[in-house]
């Protein structure tokens, strides 16, 4: 899989943190997020899923994720926003790759990306959450275009 290394700015995000199998929690989180964004008329330009664990190591029922939207740095969570938390996604060096997801198979492009990055002779993965930014509305288009982000650091020799 083709990817590039680039410097990424810190993002302020608001949304929901969930624990459980990602196949269920990400969908549930975005349903909650959509209701909250529409109900509060939140202006955003990015919809993001943040993944905190390695699904090959952590049991499915303990996998953590956040479904969030990017918001201005001075954003204040409106009243009556139960369950919504404000947080940041660290900036820094990231490997980024774009993929098209069909049949809701988000894991295949992620595994391809991780496998490609593992072969890199200049960078290694940093111990930070990974995330994906949605580039289209897959609910209406039947597929998802996503940009995947994995934090990296120079390879220690």
From Swiss-Prot:
SMART domains: AraC_E_bind
Coiled coil is among the record's keywords: no
GO molecular function per UniProt: DNA topoisomerase type II (double strand cut, ATP-hydrolyzing) inhibitor activity
Recorded family membership: Belongs to the DNA gyrase inhibitor family.
Function of the molecule: Inhibits the supercoiling activity of DNA gyrase. Acts by inhibiting DNA gyrase at an early step, prior to (or at the step of) binding of DNA by the gyrase. It protects cells against toxins that target DNA gyrase, by inhibiting activity of these toxins and reducing the formation of lethal double-strand breaks in the cell.
InterPro entries: AraC_E-bd, DNA_gyrase_inhibitor, DNA_gyrase_inhibitor_GyrI, GyrI-like, Reg_factor_effector_dom_sf
Entry protein name: DNA gyrase inhibitor
Binding partners and assembly: Interacts with DNA gyrase.
Main location as per UniProt: cytoplasm
GO CC terms of this entry: cytoplasm
Keyword annotations: Cytoplasm, Stress response
A Pfam entry, by short name: GyrI-like
Locations listed in the record: Cytoplasm
